[in-house]
Amino acid sequence: MTNWQQQLPLTDTQKNELDKSVLRYLNWNYKQTVRHEHAQDYESVRHAIVTLSGFLLQESVDRQEFISNNDTSNESMVDIDELLLPKKWNSIVRLQKKIIELEQNTETLVSQIKDLNTQVSELAQFKPTTSNGASAHNVLKWIPRNLPSCLINVESSVTSVKLHPNLPIVFVATDHGKLYAFDLFNYTIPLASLQSHTKAITSMDVLFTNFTNSSKKNYLVVVTASKDLQIHVFKWVSEECKFQQIRSLLGHEHIVSAVKIWQKNNDVHIASCSRDQTVKIWDFHNGWSLKTFQPHSQWVRSIDVLGDYIISGSHDTTLRLTHWPSGNGLSVGTGHEFPIEKVKFIHFIEDSPEIRFRTPSTDRYKNWGMQYCVSASRDRTIKIWEIPLPTLMAHRAPIPNPTDSNFRCVLTLKGHLSWVRDISIRGQYLFSCADDKSVRCWDLNTGQCLHVWEKLHTGFVNCLDLDVDFDSNVTPRQMMVTGGLDCKSNVFMR
């Protein structure tokens, strides 16, 4: 055996089969191309292939078989083995892809096992301190693991997601105007689905009413806003697992961008903002429009409500604070370079002095009930602002502070590579999602990014939701849900 034969990682039989496959492919190729495109070279090419077979094929029987198959009298016959080589080549490529997929799945499973082992260790050391079996401190310290607990698929891109305040149910709104309710313990089929709008749903909010008047029964309200210029209000009937429409709110003249529902005493109100540059306040019980004001010169994209105050973010790159009962604009924040996608108040939480921005710095801010807010923008940044105190007068609506009416940016979070779409605050953590297909967790105390989820979605991540930490009517749970352009919702649970 020669030196080059020793270097070839094939047995004699394997080498012979490979040579035959190569010759058969060359034979098929010259029949298909040379005879039609280079007819003048037909005989010379055919002779060269026959000569080559004499060198490569070891057995005389194999050579004779190939020569007879290559004879011109048999040119109408198609050897079924002539395409064996390209078929094998294609099979190898498919096998390589399959191997890569299996390796990725193995890595995912190994990571999931590590996360589960970590959770088991934490649970073994965990000591419950509250009646529901979880300490408030540990609940607020929770950061979701790398992989979701369940994956929900719908028919079109997910535009908004909301968790039921008390039950293991997630509400999903889509770009086709459909509204879904999924049981997180049996999510293969939705509990309910409804074509709630004729165009895309842009925003959704939920509220479990807490009427002190015994004549009114408490229930969950789901509010949706849409590109069809309408706002729909639904009652979630838990006993029948269905949406029951209460009313529609009409009045905006362009796309309704965001909607918010809240309760103060026995009064329930709904706030909405639109591309028509207005913000409207609605009475939940009768559907009347109580107030309309125009805080911005361009499209109002997002709002949040805290008591009698509304913060709004706009296409004009500013965010503004308004006293909604009077319509008085109180202060403005400038600093973003591109349109603002999301705004939120940062609520105070009790007994957490170690958490930055969650405790008032002065008694005046404590009495006012707010001090900080956060905004997310298309400029890829998230900014935390200190809101200036307005001039407060007894029995009168607040007015702007003549010496200080501008928000002060106290922290800028940078890390996303594209538009930041949504934000949610829980304890000392701020969660954000963006068009860079990632979800990030930030530490409010340090401003550092603690964790990044990069492979949750294959497209833009449009929305996310976590249980709020400032409402006693919401069950403290360790859950997070995300929704994306890839028609999927990822749910994380401990």
Swiss-Prot record:
Localisation per UniProt entry:
Cytoplasm, Cytoskeleton; Cytoplasm, Cytoskeleton, Spindle pole
- Domain LisH as annotated: residue spans: 14-46
Give the InterPro entries listed for this entry: Dynein_regulator_LIS1, G-protein_beta_WD-40_rep, LIS1_N, WD40/YVTN_repeat-like_dom_sf, WD40_repeat_CS, WD40_repeat_dom_sf, WD40_rpt
| Gene Ontology, cellular component aspect | cytoplasm; microtubule; microtubule associated complex; spindle pole
Q: Which GO terms describe its molecular function?
A: dynein complex binding
PANTHER family membership: F-BOX AND WD REPEAT DOMAIN CONTAINING 7, WD40 REPEAT PROTEIN
**SMART domains associated with the record:** WD40
Describe the family membership recorded for this protein in Swiss-Prot or TrEMBL.
Belongs to the WD repeat LIS1/nudF family.
- Which UniProt key words apply to this protein? Cell cycle, Cell division, Coiled coil, Cytoplasm, Cytoskeleton, Microtubule, Mitosis, Repeat, Transport, WD repeat
Question: Per its database record, what is this protein's job?
Answer: Positively regulates the activity of the minus-end directed microtubule motor protein dynein. Plays a central role in positioning the mitotic spindle at the bud neck during cell division. Targets cytoplasmic dynein to microtubule plus ends, thereby promoting dynein-mediated microtubule sliding along the bud cortex and consequently the movement of the mitotic spindle to the bud neck.
Tell me the ranges holding the WD repeats. Answer: 153-192, 196-244, 251-292, 295-334, 347-395, 415-454, 457-492
UniProt name for this protein = Nuclear distribution protein PAC1
Q: Where are the transmembrane segments?
A: none
According to the UniProt entry, the coiled-coil residues are: 90-123
Q: Name one GO biological process term.
A: establishment of mitotic spindle orientation
What does the record note on quaternary structure?
Self-associates. Interacts with NDL1 and dynein.
Q: What is known of its domains?
A: Dimerization mediated by the LisH domain may be required to activate dynein.
